[in-house]
């Protein structure tokens, strides 16, 4: 977050983007994103992505793109637009766009309010992008155009995921839960039921991840704590769940008697 904040504070150009150093980008990504912004008069642009490991690439899951509108002059809904809170909900709901910053470009002028620049939260290892995007879009008129074409290649580090599974609850886990809880509290003023359902679903997934870890590691004390938190969340509406993910969730739900 420190590097991103310094970059934003020192930037003098018209556009801002944030690419992760270990990922790959398509040769035309920024030309296509900026062209889409200029043609459709939006404040930002977002493209689809593909995940890759040493074994090859894996497409970002195609979403229904619910709640976005076909942009002017677009073909087969290749480019679509929306703005404000609706845009943030698309990031949360559609897996191929995602609540991250690395597949997006912004006009520098929209990344500030009367209070100053929108800076990333310090000392947060997971969820800082989502929280930042909420500030930029929720309750504001910031517009975005979506390009369904995958132009960004995100490196999926499966070895790191395996490592964190072995070491139990991590800072990533705690940050993810905290960010969802804070966002849920923050967006109440918007009185948007669907947004709250989306964040509640993401909180459920974050807590369920910790509960599974505690169960596998026989960490009784933490299991009881997070199991109670999971029960307090209660029934949730699911979003963007694949068949395999649904089966796995239902198996764990039955095991933990959450149904």
Regions found by a protein language model. Give the residues of each.
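Short alpha-helical segments used as structural interaction elements across diverse proteins
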Residues: 1, 101, 197-199, 245, ...
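Nucleotide-sugar donor-binding/catalytic module of glycosyltransferases
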Residues: 1-178, 182-189
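Membrane-interface aromatic/basic loop that binds lipid-linked glycans or pyrophosphate carriers
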Residues: 76, 213-259
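Residues within HEAT/ARM-like alpha-solenoid scaffolds
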Residues: 171-175, 194-202
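Generic structural signal for well-ordered, non-membrane alpha-helices
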Residues: 178-185, 205, 228, 232
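Long, charge-rich low-complexity segments
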Residues: 179-197, 248-259
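Secondary-structure edge/capping motif, primarily at the C-terminal ends of alpha-helices
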Residues: 187-190, 210-218
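Amphipathic alpha-helical repeat scaffolds of TPR domains
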Residues: 200-212
